Regions:
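Signature for HUH/AEP ssDNA processing cores
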Residues: 1-136, 143-166
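Catalytic "initiation/cleavage/transfer" segments centered on a nucleophilic residue
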Residues: 171-204
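Flexible loop/turn segments at secondary-structure boundaries
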Residues: 138-139, 194
């Protein structure tokens, strides 16, 4: 695991979020049958404990796919990651764009290559702040000037989806609706272990 990459990324994402907010981590052990409850782990850390959080992720990264919740949670939950009603602040807008290849559930048309996907993003204004390569696509980010309460940003998330759905449709490509506040996204510095060939999750 690239701990420095993971830590620097999370610091950028949550830089303006109050330290007492909670970050949820979801991990799946790819050495265990995915349907088994034992394959799933949920971790919690406060925003002001990012170094500790990354230390906790390091041993998991050898066998797990690891995601984090883009929205902070108001409190640490006893069970599960929670839903929209548990989310507090959104620090950035995001996309989750699959690129054609193995491992995707959809039969819809997807951008054929990384080059095509990056060209599409490059044509959009404002430009991205980060583009994370997930091992099966990309997750671009646009940081907000200030974290926005989920109750306020919900209509904007719907509009964001419709905007990008239209853009991709013009190219003949499909976009999943992955813009719920409780959305989880991959942590750079970890690995996509969906197949036997582990692929580093990096920043383009």
């Amino acid at each position: 695991m690239d701990k420095e990459l993971a830590l620097n990324f999370l610091k950028e994402i949550f830089e303006k979020v109050p330290g007492d907010q909670w970050i949820s981590i979801f991990a799946i052990d790819r050495t265990v049958e995915p349907s088994a409850r034992a394959s799933q782990k949920i971790l919690w850390n406060r925003v002001d404990e990012l170094e500790e959080l990354v230390d906790r992720l390091e041993p998991l990264s050898a066998t797990h796919c690891i995601w984090y919740g883009i929205a902070t949670r108001r409190a640490r939950l006893e069970k599960g990651r929670g839903g929209a009603e548990d989310c507090a602040l959104i620090p950035a807008l995001w996309l989750d764009l699959d690129i054609a290849g193995p491992g995707h559930k959809t039969a819809e048309n997807l951008p054929p290559t990384m080059e095509d996907t990056l060209k599409l993003l490059d044509e959009y204004n404002p430009p991205t702040d980060f583009i994370v390569s997930t091992g099966g696509g990309v997750q671009p980010y646009w940081l907000l000037d200030e974290p926005v309460p989920v109750s306020i940003v919900l209509p904007d998330l719907d509009n964001w989806y419709y905007t990008w759905q239209k853009i991709l449709k013009e190219h003949g490509w499909h976009l999943d609706n992955v813009f719920d506040p409780a959305r989880i996204l991959r942590v750079p510095g970890t690995f996509n272990r969906k197949t036997s060939n582990a692929i580093p999750v990096t920043i383009v």
